[in-house]
Amino acid sequence: MGEVLEFEEYVRTRQDALLRSARRLVPDPVDAQDLLQTALARTYGRWETIEDKRLADAYLRRVMINTRTEWWRARKLEEVPTEQLPESPMDDATEQHADRALLMDVLKVLAPKQRSVVVLRHWEQMSTEETAAALGMSAGTVKSTLHRALARLREELVARDLDARALEREERERCAA
């Protein structure tokens, strides 16, 4: 009974932070809630095996990453490639919100492993060693994966900026004609 109360207290105190982590792993808010609930259910069944409860966040993040990867693999089989990706709707209430939405969208181009490394290092602000432990890889692998992921993100942002400029130029030419 004590383990159940301990788990409930853990969830109550960490729920907001864990939901933010889930939101960084999947862009859709409903999917993020589903991801967190699935991870919590899986963790609850193994709660007593976590000897050091201070590592519970890392354990749960690992479960979320694994679950997200399972979902991604299942969806990948169902997806049909298209010529052009649809634009994701953005609420342009503030420029910061727009930038965040752009970054969340650009993160989609990364492989799940790369996205996990970027999210844990830059959004969760985990050290290289903490990220390596959470993902079950060496610190060197984290560094090289992060390097490649950031290079890919830069390429994607440059490409999107060039596409946007070309569209603006075409629109100006069309209006001038």
UniProtKB/Swiss-Prot annotation:
GO terms for cellular component: cytoplasm. InterPro entries: RNA_pol_sigma-70-like, RNA_pol_sigma-70_dom, RNA_pol_sigma-E_actinobac, RNA_pol_sigma70_ECF_CS, RNA_pol_sigma70_r2, RNA_pol_sigma70_r4_t2, RNA_pol_sigma_r2, RNA_pol_sigma_r3/r4-like. This is RNA polymerase sigma-E factor. Its main location: cytoplasm. Belongs to the sigma-70 factor family. ECF subfamily. Residues 128-147 bind DNA. One of its GO terms (biological process) is response to stress. Induction: By CseB, in response to cell envelope stress. A motif (Polymerase core binding) lies at residues 34-47. It comes from the Bacteria. Sigma factors are initiation factors that promote the attachment of RNA polymerase to specific initiation sites and are then released. This sigma factor is required for normal cell wall integrity; it is recruited by RNA polymerase to transcribe genes with cell wall-related functions. It is also involved in the transcription of the dagA gene coding for an extracellular agar-degrading enzyme. Keywords: Cytoplasm, DNA-binding, Sigma factor, Transcription, Transcription regulation. Pfam families: Sigma70_r2, Sigma70_r4_2. It comes from Streptomyces coelicolor (strain ATCC BAA-471 / A3(2) / M145). One of its GO terms (molecular function) is sigma factor activity. It is found in: Cytoplasm.
